[in-house]
Amino acid sequence: MNYEAIVLAAGQGKRMNAGMNKQFIELGGEPLIVRTLKVFDGDERCNGIVLVVNPTERGQFEQLFERYRIRKVVAFADGGQERQHSVYNGLQALRSGEIVLIHDGARPFVRIRHLHELADAAVQYGAAIPAVRVKDTIKKVDGLFVEQTIDRSSLWAVQTPQAFRLSLIMEAHEEAKKAGYLGTDDASLVERLGRPVKILEGDYRNIKLTTPEDLLFAEAILASRIAE
């Protein structure tokens, strides 16, 4: 099944301490957002990309599209106050389509095969998300004292892209907006409707670049891929 993609690139990434939008930080000689967009741009099943950005930075992104020959960005949407608002704006900008994949621009290492698996699962189940099993011991803490050790056997760390039938995720966002509900990810809005969300095995290398330390991991992942 073909799909449309929404890629989020409006956050300023203050924890990166880069003095600019982290999407413009170079990773292996290319801006972070370019590496992310190239995955979707090179996927024949991707019909088009809506890029959510700060409107003051549109010109910078357009220059990157020209320089790196990114062809599938069909529309811009403005970033909102919260991530959820940014996604909603992106959904409003979609041209059409049955399946939408919503992805963080700061995750450049997603594989095309995972895009296909998620899109196909969204057709079957309505909603599908990638996740990896939690490896570390998780503690619930109160006032910097351990209150409880959480059983990690059923815990998964969720990633993006998250895939949905367009009609379902639109309904989920509309209902959340009416109720003033702010979720931690898009799948949580679908869960709120009582609808099932399918988990697919993700990839530990599909990291989100948030802090300067993440750049070190990203360079190592990039080097390992070049060596493959």
Swiss-Prot record:
Family the entry assigns: Belongs to the IspD/TarI cytidylyltransferase family. IspD subfamily.
Entry-linked InterPro entries: IspD, IspD/TarI, IspD/TarI_cytidylyltransf_bact, ISPD_synthase_CS, Nucleotide-diphossugar_trans
Transmembrane segments: none
GO biological process: isopentenyl diphosphate biosynthetic process, methylerythritol 4-phosphate pathway
Site residues, Transition state stabilizer: 15, 22
Top EC category: transferase
Gene3D superfamilies xref list: Spore Coat Polysaccharide Biosynthesis Protein SpsA, Chain A
PROSITE patterns linked to this entry: ISPD
Pfam families, per database record: IspD
Keywords, sorted A to Z: Isoprene biosynthesis, Nucleotidyltransferase, Transferase
Catalyses which reaction(s): 2-C-methyl-D-erythritol 4-phosphate + CTP + H(+) = 4-CDP-2-C-methyl-D-erythritol + diphosphate
Organism field: Geobacillus thermodenitrificans (strain NG80-2)
Keyword Transmembrane on entry: no
PANTHER family: 2-C-METHYL-D-ERYTHRITOL 4-PHOSPHATE CYTIDYLYLTRANSFERASE, CHLOROPLASTIC
EC number: 2.7.7.60
Pathway membership: Isoprenoid biosynthesis; isopentenyl diphosphate biosynthesis via DXP pathway; isopentenyl diphosphate from 1-deoxy-D-xylulose 5-phosphate: step 2/6
Record-annotated site: Positions MEP for the nucleophilic attack: 152, 208
NCBIfam families to which the protein is assigned, alphabetical: ispD
GO MF term set: 2-C-methyl-D-erythritol 4-phosphate cytidylyltransferase activity
Function recorded in the entry: Catalyzes the formation of 4-diphosphocytidyl-2-C-methyl-D-erythritol from CTP and 2-C-methyl-D-erythritol 4-phosphate (MEP).
Protein name as annotated: 2-C-methyl-D-erythritol 4-phosphate cytidylyltransferase
CDD domains per the UniProt record, alphabetical: CDP-ME_synthetase
